[in-house]
Amino acid sequence: MDKSLEEKLMEQGKKAKAASRFLATASTTLKNEALLKTADALEAQGAEIVAANAIDLELGEKQGLTPALLERLALNESRIKDMAQGLREIAALPDPVGEVLGMWRRPNGLEVGRIRTPIGVIGIIYESRPNVTADAAGLCLKAGNAILLRGGEEALNSNRIIARIIAQSAKDCGIPEGAVQLVDSEDRQAAVYMMKMNDYLDVLIPRGGKGLKQAVLEHASVPVIMTGMGNCHVYVDALADLSKAQKIVFNAKVQRPSVCNAAETLLVNAKIAGDFLPAMIAELKGAGVEIRGCERSREIVPDILPAREEDWDEEYLDLILAVKVLDSVEDAIEHINCHGTGHSEAIISEDYSSVRRFISAVDAAAVYANASTRFTDGNVFGFGAEMGISTQKLHARGPMGLQELTTTKFIIYGDGQIR
C-alpha cells in the first residue's frame, strides 16, 4: 500500500513539473481566464460542494472533532461565494511574473536586470479548511506555479470536488491537468512522502498545528516555508486608553476565535490592571470566554481559573484566553518573545515611546499599535487572498500573496562581451 501511494505521488510530481514549465510562460490573459472560469464553476456547482461537505461534517462529528475544527471545516453558500469572489479578486491583481525589479548598466557594457519568475511546483499540506484548496490553487496559478494539494482527511470529500472543479476549469482553458492536483488519500504517510519529494517540489508550505510542524521538522528534506501557528498577544500598557483597549481585546478574542490571528493571551500592566480587568473579564465571560489567569490577575478577579505554565504557550483556537499581569512594557516584550510564535502581536498604549519600543523589540511577522491582531490577513493588507501567514524569516514573512509565491532571476544582455 505504501509503495503504491509513493509511486502515485511521484507520478503526480512528474505531471506537476511538466505543467509548471507550461505555466512559467503562460500569459496573464490565460491565467485570468482559468481563474474566472473556476469562480463561475464553483458557484454553479455549489450544491454539490455543500453536499460533499455535509459528509465531511457528519464524519467529523462522529470522530469527535472540536467545535473549532468543525467551524473551520464547514462550507455553505455564503462561503462558496466568498471562495469564488476570492478567485475573481486574484484575477484582478497585477501579474507578478515578469516584473522588472531593477535594470542597470555595467562599465563593460553589460545590461543586468532582475525579474520575478514563478517558483515552479508548490506543495501545500493543510488541515480542516477546504476553502484553502481554492485560495491556494488560485494564487499558485496566477503566480505561474503548479500546485500539489494535500488537505486534511477530515475535509477529503470537500477537497475532492473543489480540486476537480479547479483542475477541469483550468484544463478547459488549455492549462495542463497536472497544474492543480489533489493528493487523494486519507493515509497520513502521504504528507511524509511529500516532505521528501525533492525532485518535484520546489517548496512545501505546511498550514497546521504543532503536530504538523513537528512532523515537518523531523521529515522534510524539501525547502519549507512554515505558516500558521498563532499564539498571539495583546498587551494593555499603563498609558492605554482603556475604552479602546476593551474593544480591541474583545474583538481579537471573540470575533473569530478559531483562526490563527485571534488573541490567545492578554497581558496587562499592573498599574491599570485593577481598573481594567474586572470589566474586561466580565465582558469576555459574557461572550462565553473561559479565562485562565495568573495569581496577580486572580487577586483582582478571583472567580477565574488558575493559569498553568503551559497556557502561555497554547494556541487555543477557541473561546479561551490566558491573562497575565506584568510590571512594564519590557516584561511584556520578554514574555512575547519567549512564548509567542512570531505571528501577530499588539500593544494598546497612548505613550509613543512604549509603542516604538514594543514595535522595535517584538519578534513577529506583524506588530500592531492600537489595533486588533485580527487584521493579519492578505486581503486586509491589500495582497488579495493569501497562501498562509509565514512565521519564519526566509523566504517570506507574514501574509503570503502573489509576490511571495515567486522567486527572481537575473537577465543579462550583452554585445559579445567575454571575461
Curated annotation (Swiss-Prot):
Keyword Electron transport recorded: no
Pathway of action: Amino-acid biosynthesis; L-proline biosynthesis; L-glutamate 5-semialdehyde from L-glutamate: step 2/2
Pfam family, one: Aldedh
Localization, UniProt: Cytoplasm
Superkingdom field: Bacteria
SUPFAM superfamilies: ALDH-like
Keyword Cytoplasm: yes
Predominant subcellular localization, coarse grouping: cytoplasm
Regions crossing the membrane: none
Family annotation (CDD domains): ALDH_F18-19_ProA-GPR (cd07079)
One annotated GO molecular function: NADP binding
Reaction it catalyzes: L-glutamate 5-semialdehyde + phosphate + NADP(+) = L-glutamyl 5-phosphate + NADPH + H(+)
One GO CC annotation: cytoplasm
GO annotation (BP), single: L-proline biosynthetic process
This protein's UniProt keywords: Amino-acid biosynthesis, Cytoplasm, NADP, Oxidoreductase, Proline biosynthesis
Entry's EC annotation: 1.2.1.41
Function: Catalyzes the NADPH-dependent reduction of L-glutamate 5-phosphate into L-glutamate 5-semialdehyde and phosphate. The product spontaneously undergoes cyclization to form 1-pyrroline-5-carboxylate.
Family: Belongs to the gamma-glutamyl phosphate reductase family.
UniProt-recorded name of the protein: Gamma-glutamyl phosphate reductase
